[in-house]
Amino acid sequence: EHAQAKRFTLEAYPLVALLEGARVTMQPGASDLHYDVSLTYADGRKIEERVYAPNQLGHAQDGTPELSPTGWLRVRDAEGVPQIDAAQATEFQQVFRSIVDTVRGHAWGAHEPYFDRLEIRVDLPGIDFALPVDEEIVSTFEALHEDVYFSLLEHFQQHSGRPSGDRGLQPGQIIPDIRRHDGAARVLISLEPFAALAPVAPAALETPLAQMREPLSAAQIAGCMAAFGGDTFQAVSRQGRPVLGTYLRGPGPAVFISGAQHANETSGVVGALRAAQALAARGDAHFALIAAENPDGYALFNRLREHHPRHMLHASRYSALGDDIAYRERAPFFEREGRHQAHAISGAQLHINLHGYPAHEWTRPLSGYLPRHFELWTIPKGFFLVLRHHPGWGERARRLIEGVTARLARNVPGLVEFNARQLELFHAHALETGFDVLNGIPVQVTESDREALPLALISEFPDETVYGDRFVFAHTVQMETVLAATDLHRNAGV
């Protein structure tokens, strides 16, 4: 009763894919924390099993009940009579609780931000392996990173008097650095100042953007941005890194193209640069471009992926202030000032904002399993588009989303099939569609005045964190999204 709806069908992901060739049916069961498993074989045999799912009821900081997986110790005597049958805190759970309790017990003061960097170094044994299903991995190291990061965000949201999930919170930069270690677990929590920065010199690419098989470095991004020329503009991040922008003047309406608002979503950076190169090569380009909006988060992402290259690394998602730059509420605006300049210099009415999301299952097993406020993002569901429009722009938004999805389905080989595979598995475990599907691409269109420009097209590719052919495919889809939206906006008046 304290588990979220569909919690256990989602927890079973990706069982349906692992049992390829078998028909799998999942139905709600009793509330006694057992899976009832019925196996029917081709030869007519039937086997019934009950599998215990050890869970323990706890509460989030705001009092929300959380039914979370736990260790369990069951001891029977020589006659088979249970002597111990109870939850047993594992080392993994004890590490998590020690971190959260230490942070909760500290006197943080009354004003944001509360620190520059909150470094949480953890060394412990664990599990980390790939599954034979798409980009899926199973990792206790990743799970701990995610649960520590978001649990501490929730603590500081409550400490500051903000609602749970508030993205404007500026606690400072929270950095869970989780490492594999075969001995006893170790935890070191420290408050650190921001480090002095070395200048980043623009670097030329040794591989064409179209063939990039991993995220770009900051130097490579700077080199690509410098090559455009145009009217350059710049903001400065909280840690002092440049937020590089350029404006290419041309005929017709302008668009604003951006990537890496969330810095662990890296396919959009390459996609934005590739699209800008293609538009510039036509000779009539008219756009403002910020390929990497969040350079502090991007630097942290590159630091953390040295140890866990395939993890989603959500601690690098937000800025060094700890907020989502798109939700920044007041000056100094730092990175967001780049958007303000892009809007002013270009007069754009369409923002093409390239994003990503986890390429494999996202869990918080120490806090109720499903990621709070992000439950619909817990498993991949293909490439999809979110379109937000101001009041009065609904018809133009409809034409834009119809045109972009049709062109993507036509111009990107394998995209519709890729989406169909991921959506089929999503439906099997989420027991819902999640989004409308248009031309084989999930879409969500909403009226909102939160976006600065009248039209905001947000792309979402499951790219956290992929490499090789999948990364090339990801940034190709991102590029084609920009090209399709730009052409439709310029030529069809949407």
What positions do the PLM features span?
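Alpha-helical scaffolding within the catalytic cores
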Residues: G240-R241, R303-H308, I441-T446
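Amphipathic alpha-helical scaffolding segments
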Residues: A272-A276, Q478
